[in-house]
């Protein structure tokens, strides 16, 4: 079990890194969008490639961050019911949900989306828009994002089993790390006192 917990920590580290990188992608999307709008209204120039790169980046933010959201224990769930159970009861509910809902859905989407990506790659599929981009990178984001979600679900499963065996702390507790803004607010508050 210790080897599995070590694997779980590795998966968590990868997912955390991807989640942190996605923050920068949001900034890039905003800059591209603003730049496109400024160019369109000031020099009357616009390209479909700018619009498409925005939705490529949006997909690159949204799909991998499903795993990050699972790591942070922020996914929508049946908290109304599970909050009435002890930590062990919640762990059993999470194990059931991972095994019978999350994993089958994620594996199904991964399996069904892979041939779509392969077809786009092999045919060098291009966007229908004039000046558009190649499509296969966008198609790759779907199986890639769901692969990350499957890996994170496996990590969450391992942590729940480890918790039930008394080998790790309760993984259902939400991370309570402060954001940079919250840390700055605390520093300012301490200086004012």
What are these regions (language model features)?
Residues 1-193:
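Alpha-helical transmembrane segments and membrane-interface helix-loop junctions
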């Amino acid at each position: 079990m210790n080897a599995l917990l070590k694997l779980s920590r590795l998966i968590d580290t990868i997912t955390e890194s991807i989640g942190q990188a996605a923050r920068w992608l949001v900034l890039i999307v905003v800059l591209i969008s603003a730049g496109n709008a400024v160019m369109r209204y000031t020099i009357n120039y616009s390209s479909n490639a700018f619009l498409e790169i925005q939705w490529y980046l949006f997909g690159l933010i949204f799909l991998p961050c499903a795993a990050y959201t699972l790591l942070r224990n922020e996914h929508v769930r049946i908290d109304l019911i599970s909050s009435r159970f002890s930590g062990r009861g919640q762990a059993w509910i999470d194990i059931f949900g991972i095994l019978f809902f999350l994993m089958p859905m994620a594996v199904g989407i991964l399996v069904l989306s892979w041939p779509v990506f392969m077809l786009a790659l092999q045919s060098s599929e291009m966007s229908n828009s004039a000046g558009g981009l190649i499509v296969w990178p966008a198609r790759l984001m779907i199986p890639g994002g769901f692969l990350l979600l499957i890996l994170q679900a496996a990590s969450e499963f391992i942590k729940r089993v480890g918790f039930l065996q008394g080998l790790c702390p309760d993984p259902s507790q939400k991370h309570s790390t402060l954001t940079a803004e919250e840390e700055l607010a605390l520093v300012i508050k301490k200086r004012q006192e």
